[in-house]
């Protein structure tokens, strides 16, 4: 896929010159370890080839932002710091992580891949400190401050197994599955309608009874997860978090 990825990214960057185009390369280990976790022999080498080409492309496409992403799971939680250090040679514009979760779309339900709370806690603390210590300015400083809070939020969710702050999935965020199904999020993955059946009009689904029922379930805290996509929207709608982030940005911490 290297040629196809580079060609399409180049085209997107060219046609959207006033937008930042972000691309995440997901790496869960170094070399063979990454291949073993992903179950795809040779994936590391192909990823490196793609990354090298993208870094070269970035020289002529300044609006391209390249990020390295690691999914923290039971398979790599014990040596995360080694993996983190081992990926720095790639010199990404940013480095992010997410907690591994059992998801229908990834066919990982029942696999028990979520990291143990005690194993993830020091990882979260390390990542929060790294985010806060990065010498960035402007909107990047705000992004890093929210990122630092996200890692702490994820840690608490794993320990407490409940919504630490209110979840607005199904209101502030949603998920469109490849077949057109609308989910409140990719963790519950409960279809509330299909865009193909409404001529791609979201409104009948969004304001329908099935979505309302799912929203109530979420409001009643019948689920909890540390999924990044929903968590960032939730933090933006949580005044105490926004206030803390604002103070950190002002104080430069």
Identify the role of each PLM range.
Residues 2-11, 80-84:
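Distinct, well-ordered alpha-helical segments
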């Amino acid at each position: 896929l290297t040629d196809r990825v580079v060609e399409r990214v180049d085209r997107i960057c060219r046609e959207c010159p006033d937008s930042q185009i972000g691309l995440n390369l997901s790496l869960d280990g170094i070399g063979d370890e990454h291949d073993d976790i992903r179950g795809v022999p040779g994936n590391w080498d192909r990823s490196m080839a793609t990354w090298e080409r993208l870094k070269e492309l970035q020289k002529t496409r300044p609006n391209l932002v390249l990020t390295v992403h690691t999914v923290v799971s039971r398979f790599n939680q014990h040596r995360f710091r080694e993996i983190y250090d081992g990926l720095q040679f790639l010199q990404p514009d940013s480095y992010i992580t997410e907690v591994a979760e059992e998801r229908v779309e990834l066919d990982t339900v029942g696999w028990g891949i979520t990291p143990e709370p005690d194993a993830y806690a020091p990882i979260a603390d390390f990542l929060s400190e790294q985010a806060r210590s990065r010498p960035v300015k402007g909107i990047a400083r705000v992004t890093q401050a929210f990122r630092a809070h996200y890692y702490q939020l994820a840690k608490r969710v794993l320990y407490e197994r409940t919504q630490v702050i209110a979840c607005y999935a199904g209101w502030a965020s949603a998920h469109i599955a490849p077949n057109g199904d609308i989910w409140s999020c990719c963790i519950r993955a409960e279809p509330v309608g299909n865009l193909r059946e409404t001529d791609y009009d979201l409104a009948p689904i969004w304001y329908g009874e099935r979505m309302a029922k799912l929203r109530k379930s979420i409001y009643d805290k019948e689920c909890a997860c540390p999924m990044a996509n929903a968590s960032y929207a939730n933090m933006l709608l949580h005044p105490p978090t926004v206030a803390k982030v604002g103070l950190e940005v002002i104080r430069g911490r």
